[in-house]
Amino acid sequence: MAEKKTDYASLKKGGFMRQKQKGYFSLRLQVVGGNLTAENIRVVSEVADEYGKGYVHMTSRQGIEIPFIRFEDIEEVKAKLASGGVKPGVCGPRVRTVTACQGAAGCPSGCIDTYELAKELDAHYFGRELPHKFKFGVTGCQNNCLKAEENDLGIKGGMIVNYKEEDCIQCGVCVKA
């Protein structure tokens, strides 16, 4: 009986990247806008302990990777993560997970709701196949902490100030805008 050949391209498309150690994969997770719930973090920790080597790697794009997942554990890992609301990310020539700063939800300078926008972009575009990988980034204000220009499409929040001298309290917002 012929041995079943492993489809590495499909695994990579689903966020599983081959490691240099034979039979092991690093799983990239979908972390939209850099936000995870406490439950998401718990299940990621459990998977890293049970199926990996007890740690995760934080990527430069607000992502998480769980290294040292054995090939034979991949389906169990996906099921366990799904039970905690965590989805695998993607690799290769696809739209990647959308990154975002805290925006108006928590940052004093935030002009837009970056997380809601990141979720919308992710819902419409995540995982779409393209000729090359494609990255979205959403930053909430002109401080540009997310470095919008370093993405293929960066969105930067801003405001239009309606200056009325009689209402001015010298807050400085119009100077920053």
What are these model-derived regions, one by one?
Residues 1-22, 39:
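Intrinsically disordered, low-complexity polar/charged tails and linkers
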Residues 169-177:
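Iron-sulfur cluster-binding cysteine motifs and their immediate structural context
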